[in-house]
UniProtKB/Swiss-Prot annotation:
Similarity comment text for this entry: Belongs to the TRAFAC class translation factor GTPase superfamily. Classic translation factor GTPase family. IF-2 subfamily.
Gene3D superfamilies from the UniProt entry: P-loop containing nucleotide triphosphate hydrolases, Putative DNA-binding domain, N-terminal subdomain of bacterial translation initiation factor IF2, Translation factors, Translation initiation factor IF- 2, domain 3
Descriptive protein name: Translation initiation factor IF-2
Sequence ranges of Low complexity compositional bias: 164-173
Length: 879
């Protein structure tokens, strides 16, 4: 505390306090800044008390002086009264006091009175200050005591809380230990059960395999036996033919001998010599051609599909030999069965022949060769950028902000269902964007997007990090060998953690330039637009480094990004032009479909007359809906396009039939036991990519017990013929973003068909999965509900051996199955014949209760045996 603060607290002037401090022997240099120590404050207080006492003493002395003066004046007055006359005379004779002296006396008196009053005020102020200080100290001590009390209470409460937490933690640990022991026991039981099932399954498979091998060996023996019979019959036929020829010649020789009787002996000798020569020649020929010295290796020209009989003829072997070889390879075939090129080449190589694979698409190769010669007028083209990433990480929202349109609201559930292609003009240049879906079911569509792109922008949410589809997108980008730019989205959220994203991506091999890698990172927000300009700049920088070029004229080439069937416009294909120019009126070949371009539209629906490289367009006029990913090329005329399309359709049909026949017998053996249930489905969707994604996802749900059988797929609305096919096959129709026609709806209502509409793919997957779970046979689990110990055995003429028991645990039920255990070994399984308590028949007996029971068809119950009662519970199985 400084001097000024102390003076203010004591309510005295600073000068007076300085006088007191100097009288106390304390040196002060700065009134405002010098701080008084506690010892100095005590010394000042003591000096002020001493000064107060001194002042009081002086005051008392002054009062006594005044009193004596007053007494003397009274005596003088009396004397004056007695001597009035003399006094008057003396007063008149005395010298008078001047006014100046009187004023001085009055001033001195007033000064003394003021000094006394000031001292009294100072003393009073000092006492008040001391009282205030004492009161403040008392309040401070009270607050300190109260604070210490609160701290003690807080410490005590914290100790109680810690004790409660420790007790709760111990209780939780005990519960966790009990739960783990229970789970371990259940896991052990499940493992034993699974082991038994596995052993039974392996045993069944071994039996089936042995049976199949036995049938195969029997078939091989039948073929060999048939061949031996054929060879024996052929040999017998040759011998009989020779014998007939030999007999007829001898007859003719005999006749000639009779006619020429003079030369009979010479004729017989000539005939015998001639016959011996023919016999030797026949023997030599037979030995030379029946058993070749070395196998003959021939060059076999194998087309894309060939029957078993035609392949055997080309190799100059019997069809039975070829069938036998395929049986040894594990395939059961017939002589008229179609083989694909790969299988035929494998068989030819196995039988020691050389093969040449033929291509029957010379016209197609000629068209492709003409298109590849288009190398003139090369210009810089816009980069094709594919937006990839996990579902709900903001891919479409990011592209939506760049395009300044609302697309997400139009997607079902805010999830992109198929690839969208957009051409965006920015201040820095033109960029073509492909927006791919992030749901797990659309793997094939993301792979197509990576294959037709120049740059992949991987969108990762800053608050979610790396997810399964993020990893898959990285793999697609690496497989396509395209550069990867990472856009860390949702940076406007408080929980955004870009460092975590960089760390997780580095584990997948995507390392940012900040960490010494080669991948560009942009931190953006699709909601606020933060970092969008930086992302576009990095895309264009990467495009400049790639030096993207394409022919600006000549034959147009591209790829089908997506296709659908529009009710009013027919087949509509989204095509990305990669080189050359596509014009309205050109003849186009897209996969197995062809047609003349009737109209070309951009992403905004504006009609175009022509489209150059890196331009996405919607094309109308094809004969059908091509598959997503099919190559597109402009052909010279419609006749040539039709020939190539028909050739491709025929070959696709042959290959499909060959593959179906290849697995037909295997499926027959697998389904012979009739244990596999099937869920038959028909899939109709709006675009080809959704059909593929939905079909692939549903096929992956198949198990050993329940299989998904997709009888047909297609795009467009559901027609009456679709419903008839579904009804004939007892199939459920999955309608994805399409609707049924009026006739089809009426037929479904009349016949009771099953039609389901979906707009989000995982809802369809979940419903089919639930239907498949309903076809799974439930798991039967045995739960022990009671245990009793046999204390005595009684013999009854009516019931045989009756066991007197006491229920140790749970309860015994009369109608539940039981086991008889002796030394913890099951010696009998059956059911109770009777259950009594005293003389009354009861349905159940609980723990701690005695009872008598009889085991049906079992009389060897002994004292010490245990009766275990259990029940079988059906548990619904999950896929």
């Amino acid at each position: 505390m400084t001097v000024a603060e102390l003076a203010k607290q004591l309510r005295i002037s600073i000068n007076r306090l300085l006088d007191v401090i100097s009288e106390a022997g304390i040196v002060i240099h700065d009134v405002e800044n010098d701080v008084l120590s506690p010892e100095q404050k005590v010394a000042i207080a003591g000096h002020m008390k001493q000064r107060k006492k001194q002042s009081a003493t002086e005051k008392n002395a002054a009062k006594s002086d005044n009193k004596s003066d007053k007494n003397s004046k009274t005596g003088a007055k009396k004397t004056t009264n007695r001597r009035k006359t003399d006094a008057r005379k003396s007063q008149s004779s005395e010298k008078k006091i001047s006014p100046r002296e009187l004023a001085q006396q009055l001033a001195e008196k007033k000064r003394l009175e003021q000094g006394n009053a000031q001292r009294e005020n100072e003393e009073r102020e000092y006492q008040e200050a001391l009282a205030a200080e004492e009161k403040r100290q008392q309040q401070e001590e009270a607050r300190k005591a109260k604070r210490e009390q609160k701290e003690a209470e807080a410490i005590r409460a914290e100790e109680e809380r810690l004790q409660m937490e420790a007790a709760l933690q111990a209780q939780m640990q005990e519960q966790e230990r009990i739960r783990q022991e229970k789970e371990a026991e259940e896991a052990k039981l499940n493992a034993e059960k699974e082991l038994r099932k596995q052993q039974e399954r392996e045993k069944r498979l071994a039996q089936e395999k042995a049976e199949l091998e036995r049938k195969r060996q029997e078939a091989i023996r039948d073929v060999e036996l048939r061949e031996s019979y054929e060879e024996e019959a052929e040999t017998r036929f040759h011998i009989q033919s020779k014998d007939r020829n030999f007999g007829s010649k001898n007859d003719r020789s005999g006749k000639r001998a009779v006619k020429n009787g003079d030369d009979e002996r010479s004729g017989e000798r000539r005939n015998n010599a001639r016959n011996n020569t023919r016999r030797r020649n026949n023997d030599n020929k037979k030995g030379k051609f029946e058993k070749p010295v070395a196998p003959i290796s021939r060059e076999v020209r194998i087309p894309e599909t060939i029957t078993v009989g035609d392949l055997a003829q080309k190799m100059s072997v019997k069809a039975s030999e070829l069938i036998k070889t395929m049986m040894k390879l594990g395939s059961m075939v017939t002589i008229n069965q179609l083989l694909d090129q790969e299988t035929a080449a494998l068989i030819a190589d196995e039988m020691g022949h050389r093969y040449v694979l033929l291509k029957e698409n010379e016209l197609e190769e000629q068209v492709m060769a003409q298109a590849s010669e288009n190398k003139m007028d090369v210009v810089v083209r816009a980069p094709v950028v594919t937006i990839m990433g996990h579902v709900d990480h903001g891919k479409t929202s990011l592209l939506d902000y760049i395009r300044h349109t609302r697309v997400v609201s139009g997607e079902a559930g805010g999830i992109t269902q198929h690839i969208g292609a957009y051409r965006v003009t920015t201040e820095r240049g033109v960029i073509t964007f492909l927006d791919t879906p992030g749901h797990a079911a659309f793997t094939a569509m993301r792979a197509r997007g990576a294959n037709v792109t120049d740059i992949v922008v991987l969108v990762v949410a800053a608050d979610d990090g790396v997810m399964p589809q993020t990893k898959e997108a990285i793999q697609h980008a690496k497989a396509a060998n395209v550069p990867l730019i990472v856009a860390v989205n949702k940076m406007d959220k408080p929980e955004a953690d870009p460092e975590r994203v960089k760390s997780e991506l580095s584990q997948e091999g995507v390392i940012s330039e900040e960490w010494g890698g080669e991948h560009l990172f942009a931190y953006v927000s699709a909601k606020s637009g933060m970092g969008i300009d930086d992302l576009l700049e990095k895309i264009l920088i990467q495009a400049e480094m790639l030096e993207l070029t394409a022919p600006s004229s000549g034959v147009g080439k591209g790829v089908v990004v997506e296709s659908r069937l529009d009710r009013g416009r027919g087949s509509v294909a989204t095509v990305l032009v990669q080189s050359g120019v596509m014009k309205k009126g050109n003849v186009m070949l897209a996969g197995m479909e062809y047609g003349r371009i009737r109209a070309m539209l951009d992403e905004k629906g504006k009609e175009l007359e022509e489209a150059g490289p890196s331009t996405p367009v919607e094309i109308l006029g094809l004969s059908g809906t091509p598959n997503a990913g099919d190559d597109v090329i402009i052909v010279e005329n419609e006749r040539k396009a039709r020939e190539i399309a028909n050739f491709r359709q025929g070959k696709f049909k042959e290959i499909r039939i060959a593959r179906q026949q290849k697995t037909k017998l295997e499926n027959l053996f697998n389904n012979a036991d009739g244990e596999i249930s099937k869920v038959s489905l028909m899939i109709k969707a709006d675009v080809q990519g959704s059909v593929e994604a939905l079909a692939d996802s549903l096929r992956e749900l198949s198990t050993d017990e329940v299989a998904v059988n997709i009888i047909a797929t297609g795009i467009g609305g559901i027609t009456e013929s679709d419903v008839q096919l579904a009804l004939a096959s007892s199939a459920t129709i999955i309608a994805f973003n399409v609707r049924a026609e009026a006739n089809a709806k009426k037929l479904i209502e009349e016949e009771g068909g099953d039609l389901r509409y979906y707009s989000i793919i995982y809802q369809a997957i979940d419903d089919v999965k639930a239907a498949m779970q309903g076809l799974l046979s439930p798991e039967i689990r045995e739960e022990i509900i009671g245990l009793a110990e046999v204390r005595d055995v009684f013999r009854s003429s009516k019931f045989g051996a009756v066991a007197g028991c006491i229920v140790e645990d749970g309860l015994l039920k009369r109608h539940n199955p039981i086991r008889v255990l002796r030394n913890n070994v099951v010696i009998y399984e059956g059911e109770l014949e009777s259950l009594r308590r005293f003389k009354d028949d009861v349905n159940e007996v609980r723990a701690g209760t005695e009872c008598g029971l009889g085991v049906k068809n079992y009389n060897d119950v002994r004292v010490g045996d245990q009766i275990e009662c259990y029940e079988r519970v059906e548990i619904e199985r999950k896929l």
